[in-house]
């Protein structure tokens, strides 16, 4: 499986991989498929992602009034976080590190949503903005499991 380091090494000359931390890669709930292996083509910098990141599509009629497409984290993130006190912090560290490490990404191909050309913004900025969008979810999770 691609989430295994040995398999990733087979493609290491061409691709970089990242697996989210703090969430269950395979959830016991079949509706929750928030984790995925993110792959970045080394030469082009293009990121391919299944479920972890989504692209919010703006209908053409609304593009004059709403911000351009942007990255968001999967809406079921809260259900995918591991049931322990440090899961939210581990997810934040992973996402922040990914944003910094892959900041020069020009395009994100997000399965089930859209292809996002990062123009006028950058990957780091959008991932950090997406992280801000799930801040309450992460804080609720942290508080819920802090006492356990």
Label every PLM stretch briefly:
Residues 1-146:
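Metallo-beta-lactamase
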């Amino acid at each position: 499986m691609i989430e295994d380091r040995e398999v990733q090494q087979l493609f290491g000359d061409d691709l970089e991989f990242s697996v989210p931390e703090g969430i269950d890669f395979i959830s016991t709930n079949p509706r929750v498929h928030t984790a995925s292996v993110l792959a970045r083509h080394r030469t082009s910098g293009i990121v391919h992602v299944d479920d972890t990141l989504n692209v919010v599509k703006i209908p053409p009629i609304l593009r004059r009034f709403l911000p351009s497409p942007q990255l968001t984290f999967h809406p079921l993130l809260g259900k995918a976080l591991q049931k322990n006190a440090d899961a939210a912090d581990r997810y934040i560290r992973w996402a922040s590190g990914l944003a910094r490490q892959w900041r020069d990404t020009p395009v994100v191909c997000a399965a089930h949503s859209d292809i996002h050309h990062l123009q006028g913004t950058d990957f780091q900025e959008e991932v950090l903005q997406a992280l801000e969008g799930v801040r309450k979810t992460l804080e609720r999770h942290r508080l819920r499991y802090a006492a356990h």
